[in-house]
């Protein structure tokens, strides 16, 4: 498990046809469609609350905390129309949150705030599988060394 920092962003509808992942710094024009309006933020907030392990944050933020077997993840919605996802976790809960929110609004992408890459559902799933393979390899090596 690693510390993960993401933001969920709206992209222009034509961007959904682009090849993901891509780096925002390499785009000649912004693929982002701007901040979420309050009505959409409310719908995303409600959808997040339907996730397993989701509990309303008690720290005054409009946020959810997911305490999963794979780690802890916070999802919060800001008054300026942003959505942030961060925590110490595997990528599986991040994918679950993103997939749930895509059901509400299909014009979403996940921005990795550490690398600057923008992911759609398929590229994030590839990243999840790669992450799982690394973990499996670590356990295989450890088991082989112990034998």
Segments predicted by a language model, with ranges:
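Acidic (Asp/Glu-rich) sequence patches and key acidic residues
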Residues: 1-147
């Amino acid at each position: 498990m690693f510390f993960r920092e993401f933001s969920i962003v709206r992209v222009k509808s034509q961007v959904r046809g682009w090849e993901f992942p891509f780096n925002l710094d390499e785009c000649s024009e912004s693929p982002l469609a701007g901040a979420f309006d309050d009505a959409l933020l409310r719908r995303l907030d409600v959808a997040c609350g339907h996730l397993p392990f989701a509990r309303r944050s008690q720290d005054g933020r409009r946020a959810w905390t997911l305490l999963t077997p794979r780690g802890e993840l916070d999802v919060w919605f800001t008054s300026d129309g942003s959505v942030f996802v961060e925590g110490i976790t595997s990528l599986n809960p991040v994918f679950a949150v993103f997939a749930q929110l895509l059901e509400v609004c299909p014009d979403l992408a996940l921005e990795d705030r550490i690398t600057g890459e923008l992911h759609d559902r398929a590229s994030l799933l590839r990243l999840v599988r790669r992450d799982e393979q690394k973990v499996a390899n670590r356990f295989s090596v450890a088991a082989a060394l112990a034998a």
